[in-house]
């Protein structure tokens, strides 16, 4: 499947809260957001989709922004998607992050028409911009031990190479092919983002 010159998906938003009041008699809304669908192959600028929001009661983590395919800018989200590289306009932008939840996607900084895509933003850092035909890296995830094991969540995906001989970017630190991590979709297979997660820790 062709994925030339595409920006990568941004991670879902990462939020934490302590001292949340609840009772056994009160129902709470919990929604696990689906990961975004990756950019489609082929020679048309069909972009992927944003991830869906994850919700715990009044706390909403915004789904990750889709990466821009070819000449499209990245899309906004919890973390922003990376910009596509098939453009002659330096400064085309990555998607913007939601304040307090993540970082922006990488921006196109070149003027070639077949440059690599930029990386998606992560909870720990922004996605990096392309470098000519070489794609940008995904933003880093953040580690948490809330589940008893140190685990990375919400890393950004890697951009795809410029045509015909560029290189892929690196996935954001901590990105693995696993569900319920909130990672952005990478342009290396698999391209879809991972689903979100809600983790509740309480005193017994």
Show where each model-derived region lies.
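Low-complexity, glycine/proline-biased repetitive segments and flexible coils/loops
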Residues: 1-204
């Amino acid at each position: 499947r062709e994925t030339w010159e595409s920006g990568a998906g941004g991670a879902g938003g990462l939020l934490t809260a302590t001292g949340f009041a609840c009772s056994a008699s009160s129902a709470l809304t919990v929604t696990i957001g689906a990961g975004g669908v990756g950019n489609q192959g082929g020679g048309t600028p069909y972009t992927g989709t944003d991830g869906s929001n994850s919700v715990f009661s009044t706390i909403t983590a915004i789904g990750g922004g889709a990466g821009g395919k070819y000449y499209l800018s990245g899309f906004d989200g919890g973390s922003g998607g990376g910009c596509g590289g098939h453009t002659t306009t330096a400064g085309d932008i990555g998607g913007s992050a939601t304040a307090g939840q993540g970082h922006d996607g990488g921006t196109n900084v070149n003027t070639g028409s077949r440059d690599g895509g930029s990386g998606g933003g992560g909870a720990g850092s922004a996605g990096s911009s392309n470098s000519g035909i070489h794609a940008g890296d995904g933003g880093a995830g953040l580690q948490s031990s809330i589940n008893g094991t140190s685990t990375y969540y919400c890393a950004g995906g890697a951009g795809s190479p410029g045509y015909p001989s560029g290189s892929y970017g690196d996935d954001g630190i901590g990105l693995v092919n696993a569900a319920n991590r909130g990672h952005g979709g990478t342009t290396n297979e698999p391209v879809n983002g991972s689903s979100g997660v809600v983790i509740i820790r309480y005193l017994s």
